[in-house]
Amino acid sequence: MQLTNEKVDIVIIGGGCVGSGIALDATLRGYSVILLEKNDFASGASSKSSKLVHGGIRYLEKAIKQMDKAQYDLVKEGIKERSIFLKNASNIAKKLKINIPIYSYLKLIYTYFGLLIYKLMAKNKSLGKNSFVNKVVSILFSPNIKQENLKGFLSFYDGSFLDFRMIISLLQTAVSKGAIVKNYCEVNEFLYDVNNKISGVKYFDKIKNKNYEINAKVVINASGANVDNLRLKDDESTNEILALSSGIHIVVSKEFLSSNEGILLPNTSDGRVIFILPYMDYCLIGTSDNKTVYEENPKAQEQEIEYLLKEVNNYFEKHLTKEDILSSWSGIRPLVKSDKSSTEQMVREHIILKSKNDLISIAGGKWTTYRKMAEDLVSFLIKNKLLEKQKKCETKRTKLFGNDDIKELEKLISFYPISKKTKNSLKTLYGSSCIKVLNLANETDNFELINPNLPYLKAEIEYCIKEEFVEKPIDFLARRVGLCFLDKKLALSCVDVVCEEMGKILFWDEKRVEKEKFECKENINNYF
């Protein structure tokens, strides 16, 4: 067992959106922070979202129908946080126009006033004007939409983003301010002082194959769907707080959507809504919402896929089949238990708990409110005298890594021998940091592509190892460039090249390279 000599203020367990957000908030306030993630960063539900930064139009409908103030407050908070999100991560998050197909004039009036309330709630934080276009114009936008009884499209604006890139940006920003973040480090035991209060953790580093101990003033459990498992490890008598919900998404060719605007399907057979969204030159469809149990690597189930296909096909002339699916995935939402009969009805609010041994756990919430969740948690630590107050929260005005003005770099980027497709891909994935990738490619005189049918440079592999915490090939293919979320077959076609390039950089022997190829292909096969 190796011991760390230094005692830190905070150990965070979990490298998803909440853990990463807490790492940044706490570091900016002047605390020493170590974040430990048992797999890769964003390997859980945080990379398996609908990629929306939204106030929650569907939560507003529930608030009105059920006269539910909690749902209303969630929308209000979401709209406020959406504005901060888009400002601080403008390289990753963009506004998106979303169209709602309308098939009756009564529904037109109902939806129009719902969107009006949504816009009025946003006040000066609105992203754009709501609008209505008739049937003819709607069909021009979406030729495949079901035309019988179509009255037109009602449109509104929300935000969209690359969730896995947001995690990396948060972590890079936190590290630049002094945080230490480690992936593939699994906490397997808590340390306790003479008063039986938590004083640190024991963890196993899967890359170095070593056990370590670290002492801390506070240990935060931000492990998402695993929150209850860690709470029970601390206190076997504790009550579980999570109601786990699975949500799947499928990806098909962008031709199905035929525009850069999203579509919201407002009336499904079970009262949910489904989003069909442009996503990195593909089309993303989701989501489902079903009770589930904790699973390390959940996979989209047959019945969930059939549900999405059936509901989507009700709205389109040309039907989707399973053969059209290029990738699919399942994420587990860590919702907080309530008296609601279904997980879909549960309010997406968050909760912070302190155990009798001072383990601090946070659960619930949603991607859009990750920053507020982090702020609330660090403020909770100060209020409960677990940490001495230092600085105020600064995350409302902290621009994230890669968010410098890309326009100033455009001329410089144009000098490099890359295609327009590669240039756009680099800007989308790395923002202003794309110039670092290009400089690295230039230094090694290697502008070779990983695959001639894809925009990714081999130099991106080395950059992501040096700058973005990549330890395994699946980290790169799934959660740095996102290819696994787009096209499983294309991702599989890149495995050998990525493993061999990583082998050269990290000095793997042939046996290790072959082992990584096998493991990576097994992982990718989880994507449909």
Can you describe what each PLM-predicted range is?
Residues 25, 39, 92, 99, ...:
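C-terminal accessory subdomains/tails of enzymes that are appended
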Residues 229-250:
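Glycine-rich beta-alpha-beta "Rossmann" dinucleotide-binding loop(s) and their flanking helix/strand
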Residues 13, 214-224:
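Short hydrophobic core segments
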Residues 183-199:
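A conserved short coil-to-beta-strand element within the FAD-binding core of flavoproteins
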Residues 6-8, 208-218:
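Core beta-strand elements of the Rossmann-like FAD/NAD(P) dinucleotide-binding domain
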